[in-house]
Curated annotation (Swiss-Prot):
It comes from Staphylococcus saprophyticus subsp. saprophyticus (strain ATCC 15305 / DSM 20229 / NCIMB 8711 / NCTC 7292 / S-41). This is Dephospho-CoA kinase. GO terms for cellular component: cytoplasm. Belongs to the CoaE family. Catalyzes the phosphorylation of the 3'-hydroxyl group of dephosphocoenzyme A to form coenzyme A. It catalyses: 3'-dephospho-CoA + ATP = ADP + CoA + H(+).
């Protein structure tokens, strides 16, 4: 029986890497970030509603969403973040549910890759939750390097989410990403073996 697994983790925890590894093992990935971009692509009703809510500046010269502008607005105005979520979330859910149903009908196990799964109370929409976690200091370092932001900004983004300790208590399974990519792969494959998804480790993990 195909399973639906919610994959989540703190910001900059390495969740995308785990998604790639799971895809290589034959899981089908339904990615919330990709669906969020599709929801406001050029010419969509979603983007038209963003324009109505955020004004002409929300659209760039190419007719696409001005992510820098919208991002700045929602960061500084919490009520605008709620407004954006009310526009985007229903469209994202529709895109993801359609994709999930297609994969399940084909007999695949499905990974619902949702960064804010717990924050949006979506744990009941999946069979179980797998959490990718790392240390807070690693999260902050990765964010500073990846997004070219200050330590204060990185900390603010980390602290804006539910704490990793609380998420660990809420998850069904954990995937430790505090060390190297090879060790991450080993930790993931240990879980896949325990749960019966694979029969042996990859050659580079042995």
């Amino acid at each position: 029986m195909p399973k639906v697994i919610g994959l989540t983790g703190g910001i900059a925890s390495g969740k995308s890497t785990v998604s790639e590894l799971l895809s290589a093992h034959g899981f089908k990935i339904v990615d919330a970030d990709i669906a969020s971009r599709q929801a406001v692509e050029k010419g969509t009703k979603g983007l038209e509603r963003v324009k109505e809510s955020f004004g002409e500046q929300a659209i760039d010269e190419n007719g696409e969403m001005n992510r820098a502008y919208v991002g700045e607005v929602v960061f500084n105005q919490p009520e605008k973040r709620l407004e954006l979520n009310e526009i985007v979330h229903p469209i994202v859910r529709e895109i993801m549910e359609k994709e999930k149903a297609q994969y399940l009908s084909e007999g695949y196990h499905v990974i619902m890759d949702i960064p804010l799964l717990f924050e949006n109370n979506l744990q009941d929409t999946v069979d179980e939750v797998w959490l990718v976690y790392t240390s807070e200091s690693i999260q902050i370092d990765r964010l500073m390097e990846r997004n070219n932001i200050s330590m204060e900004e990185a900390k603010a983004r980390v602290y804006s989410q539910i704490s990793i300790d609380k998420k660990r208590r809420m998850a069904d399974h954990e995937i430790d990403n505090r060390d190297t990519k090879l060790e991450l792969k080993q930790n993931l494959e240990n879980l896949l073996l325990e749960e019966g998804y694979i029969e042996s480790h990859s050659e580079d993990v042995l």
